[in-house]
Amino acid sequence: MAMYFPISLLLLLLIRVSSEIPTFTGSLIVVLVFALFGLNSNTFPSSLSFSCLLISLFMLYTMSIILLPFLRFRGAYWVVLLTFTVLLTFLTFLIFLFDCLFFPLEVGLLSEANSACQFEERAIKTVRYLLY
């Protein structure tokens, strides 16, 4: 339950500071991807995933401020922002997928050595699966 607090706080901040609809939509997509893949009852988001999320949101908001004066047509602004939003969302999804495959957080169950062995086993299984 405590992990939902930063997300709700981030959403409130986005609603407050965002004046552009595409920026808010793109940020909301990234937050939803974060909520779906990074939060459940058994795992917590890793610092890498959370950092990627914050960087993506910052880039979306900054892009909307920088690009708006330079684009003459409103449609071009939407296309550029939508393209970057899709790319950032896909990047975030890949990082979450990478976290889920290789770096699961198993609190208090495994020692560091056992965790390293499991990491190697998972990597070998993944490579075998991809090759065959």
Swiss-Prot record:
Its main location: membrane. Residues 40-49, 99-132 are extracellular. It comes from the Eukaryota. Signal peptide: none annotated. Residues 1-18, 71-77 are cytoplasmic. The keyword Membrane applies. It is found in: Membrane. It is a multi-pass membrane protein. Keywords: Membrane, Transmembrane, Transmembrane helix. GO terms for cellular component: membrane. The chain crosses the membrane at residues 19-39, 50-70, 78-98. The keyword Transmembrane helix applies. Almost completely overlaps REX4. This is Putative uncharacterized membrane protein YOL079W. It comes from Saccharomyces cerevisiae (strain ATCC 204508 / S288c) (Baker's yeast).
